[in-house]
């Protein structure tokens, strides 16, 4: 089956292209990026947000299926639908579990209400509206599916939340602070596992017309993840709980998803256990450390060790893991 990937970066798209090729499919990429998407993968060097470029790629290459990796605005969703309509047999639209927002009832399934677009962040609002465009087309009979992804991690991740913890370990920190006893559970997905899930969602017979959550099957608390990073780097440290209103880290919120539908319809299973995925990610980070300009949303200075030490001294409670 010929599959066109619409958009894509050097982080996620190559893993999807590799997975497609390994399953006997023929991937191609429409992207302005000059990244290497793999041996023998055709690249249409055009703007995937340009309707004429998308239509030209679809009509000239004649893919059987399309994976929309942009899917971040309702306008982009409509553009993609117009290119697909009557020209491809099925399409898959990669959304995000951010559309659910904070939800005290976990695990969150696909029937859960999404946020009201007018009350959501700009990013979540645009995703919600894009999903609504696709859902309306599905109701009209379009053979499409939506896949809601968690926070991705893995080699070549340009943001790489794990650097917050890895840098501390590599610099020999013997203490680390986590908010609220590190009890938060934030659903993550190792990039190779998620690429496998994408291909399953594209090819499974039951997928068209459906919405699926995807994520790792094994979940870590923030404290467990912090411990796992240290162990993977052969480092030891003491983990201290500090008040959450005083200290932020990546993954410091609870949001995890019900995967039963993906398991049943797509036969999804983690092919690589998260521990191994984390070790691969950290090995890459050791070879490709992030620069001094690395940042994370809502954290003013992620490596303010003086402040971290002061919080531990004043408020810290050592965790027994």
Regions found by a protein language model. Give the residues of each.
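Active-site "gating" loop of Rossmann-like NAD(P)-dependent oxidoreductase/epimerase domains
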Residues: 96-125, 132, 136-140
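Mid/C-terminal beta-alpha module of Rossmann-like enzyme folds, strongest
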Residues: 200-259, 265, 292-296, 300-321
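Substrate-positioning beta->alpha
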Residues: 159-165, 178-202, 209-210, 224
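Conserved beta-loop-beta element that borders a ligand/cofactor-binding pocket
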Residues: 131-156
């Amino acid at each position: 089956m010929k599959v066109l990937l619409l958009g894509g970066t050097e982080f996620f798209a190559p893993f999807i292209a590799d997975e497609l090729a390994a399953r006997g499919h023929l991937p191609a990429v429409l992207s302005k990026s000059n990244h290497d998407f793999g041996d023998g993968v055709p690249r249409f060097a055009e703007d995937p947000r340009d309707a004429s470029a998308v239509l030209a790629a679809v009509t000239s290459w004649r893919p059987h299926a399309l994976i929309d990796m942009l899917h971040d605005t309702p306008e982009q969703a409509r553009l993609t639908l117009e290119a697909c309509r009557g020209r491809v047999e099925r399409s898959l639209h990669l959304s995000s579990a951010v559309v659910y927002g904070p939800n005290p009832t976990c695990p969150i399934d696909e029937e859960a209400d999404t946020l009201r677009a007018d009350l959501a962040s700009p990013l979540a609002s645009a995703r919600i509206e894009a999903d609504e465009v696709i859902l309306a087309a599905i109701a009209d009979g379009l053979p499409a599916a939506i896949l809601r992804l968690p926070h991705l991690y893995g080699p070549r991740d340009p943001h790489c939340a794990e650097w917050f913890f890895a840098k501390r370990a590599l610099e020999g920190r013997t203490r680390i602070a986590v908010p609220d006893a590190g009890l938060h559970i934030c659903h993550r997905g190792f990039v190779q596992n998620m690429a496998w899930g994408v291909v399953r969602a594209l090819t499974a017979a039951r997928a068209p017309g459906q919405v699926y959550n995807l994520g790792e099957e094994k979940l870590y608390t923030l404290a467990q993840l912090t411990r796992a990073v240290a162990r993977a780097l052969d480092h030891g440290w003491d983990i201290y709980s500090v008040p959450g209103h005083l200290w932020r880290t990546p993954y410091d919120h609870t949001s995890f998803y019900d995967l039963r539908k993906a398991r049943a319809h797509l036969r999804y299973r983690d092919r690589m256990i998260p521990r191994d995925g984390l070790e691969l990610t950290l090995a890459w980070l050791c070879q490709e450390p992030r620069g001094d300009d690395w940042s994370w949303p809502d954290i003013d200075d992620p490596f303010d060790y003086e402040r971290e030490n002061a919080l531990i001294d004043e408020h810290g409670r050592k965790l027994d893991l």
